[in-house]
């Protein structure tokens, strides 16, 4: 077999050869750099590392609830969270003991530069006691994401979301994401219970979404008592009879999501067995004939 012989480049061509390589390498580098720049850096990537985020501002939501805005590392950073996922927060007590709690953000998943939470203060709650004494520029440790439910558009004809108190946060995340996706035709029933009209969290955002997507989103509020004299929603609790009349039945292509305080969960679905285990389905939803797989507890 004959092999071709290649002449060694003469000295006078070397600068041009080197220059061509440099230009090509530079073009590849810049192209790669532009590609990297176009991808917003994700903060929470599941590496189990704690990252300190600075508190940017606090806004009063109600008499016992606040919105907390934490700055991400850069203005172009995004959280990296997936739909219906949460993060862990942590601080150390004076005795050196860690206090860790999960929270679901309410900011858009693609929001750049910050992450937002709506958090209620619980008397004697170690984390909320700590959070409610924070001031802008203080930091808090975060880790995530904690995946909850992998949402797939158009998997169900209609979903029913049952929320109580601050349990609205993961449900709001679902509502917001589904309505923003023009390809997702899933219809949504949101039944949300609070102590009083003043305790209804994210009401402006929810009402705006209902006005914008009236054919897709149906919201009904429930309160224990009316402290305004102007409330025109439902008074009392979300009951089995109400669900039987207003939610798709278990024989339909549907899914139910539930999130709220222990008494709320006990009444409708039963509590989770542990943070990672759903536990047995009980309460009103079981009585109505829903299967374990048709109900998800946040």
From Swiss-Prot:
Enzyme class of the recorded protein, top EC level: oxidoreductase
CDD domains reported in the protein's UniProt record: cyt_b5_reduct_like
Signal peptide positions (record): none
Catalytic activity: 2 Fe(III)-[cytochrome b5] + NADH = 2 Fe(II)-[cytochrome b5] + NAD(+) + H(+)
GO CC term, one of those recorded: fungal biofilm matrix
Keywords associated with the record: FAD, Flavoprotein, Membrane, Mitochondrion, Mitochondrion outer membrane, NAD, Oxidoreductase, Transmembrane, Transmembrane helix
SUPFAM superfamilies hit by this protein: Ferredoxin reductase-like, C-terminal NADP-linked domain, Riboflavin synthase domain-like
Sequence similarity: Belongs to the flavoprotein pyridine nucleotide cytochrome reductase family.
Function (record text): May mediate the reduction of outer membrane cytochrome b5.
Name under which the protein is recorded: NADH-cytochrome b5 reductase 2
Top-level taxonomy: Eukaryota, Fungi, Dikarya, Ascomycota, Saccharomycotina
